[in-house]
């Protein structure tokens, strides 16, 4: 794969935490014309074990700004835009995503994950989803009209957030693994090559060293399989 000939375009990265750091680091080696990073959070001491682009000197700074600085230092000729905002509605996400080739959801909450899913369904753009908690991770690539989405799999977000990295912890190296795999999915979409994780949920059990691609079947009644512009239930 030649970086000089690959016709890549922009990427929207939602979330600048552990997954977002790993994704951004992996993408920095690609000839992407622009990267948009959206996150409203600031760097805390408890983040450093898994958010590998941050140091003690960065405490209190915005995560999105710090990743942009690191990314820009490696690729100063590329465009990096930061949004100090939490994109947690389909409308807010779609407004930014429609200008990019691929959207990557590296968020850490169900509201944003399903908002990204619903925006992708409604506006028909490709979405890479990933999550990690404790010693387990998961990965799914969504192509509305062609593959299953989060609502096909889970129906909708839970009523409460429940287990999070803040209250349950997460293995830093697992976050890195999931983030790099998310970047690899974005590469497949941008280069239009390989076999993205359409209709397959990749699960990772770090404790047992197991990966499993679980086959998925799209829900024929889900909005992702209906006409463009359809709204999720």
Label each residue range with its predicted role.
Residues 1-233:
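Adenine nucleotide-associated cytosolic modules
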């Amino acid at each position: 794969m030649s970086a000089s000939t690959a016709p890549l375009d922009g990427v929207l990265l939602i979330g600048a935490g552990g997954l977002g750091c790993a994704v951004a680091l992996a993408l920095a080696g690609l000839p992407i014309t622009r990267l948009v990073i959206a996150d409203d959070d600031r760097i805390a001491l408890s983040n450093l074990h898994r958010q590998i682009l941050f140091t003690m000197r960065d405490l209190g700074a915005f995560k999105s700004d710090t990743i942009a600085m690191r990314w820009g230092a490696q690729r100063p000729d590329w465009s990096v835009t930061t949004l100090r905002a939490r994109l947690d509605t389909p409308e807010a996400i779609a407004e930014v995503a429609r200008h990019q080739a691929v959207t990557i959801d590296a968020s850490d909450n169900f509201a944003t994950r399903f908002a990204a899913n619903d925006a992708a369904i409604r506006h028909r753009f490709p979405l890479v989803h990933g999550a990690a908690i404790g010693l387990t991770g998961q990965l799914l690539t969504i192509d509305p009209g062609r593959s299953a989405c989060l609502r096909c799999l889970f129906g909708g977000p839970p009523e409460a957030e429940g287990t999070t990295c803040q209250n349950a912890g997460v293995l830093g190296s697992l976050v890195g693994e999931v983030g790099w795999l998310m970047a690899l999915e974005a590469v497949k979409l941008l280069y239009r090559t390989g076999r993205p994780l359409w209709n397959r949920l990749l699960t990772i059990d770090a404790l047992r060293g197991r990966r499993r691609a679980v086959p998925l079947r799209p829900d024929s009644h889900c909005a992702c399989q209906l006409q463009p512009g359809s709204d999720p239930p």
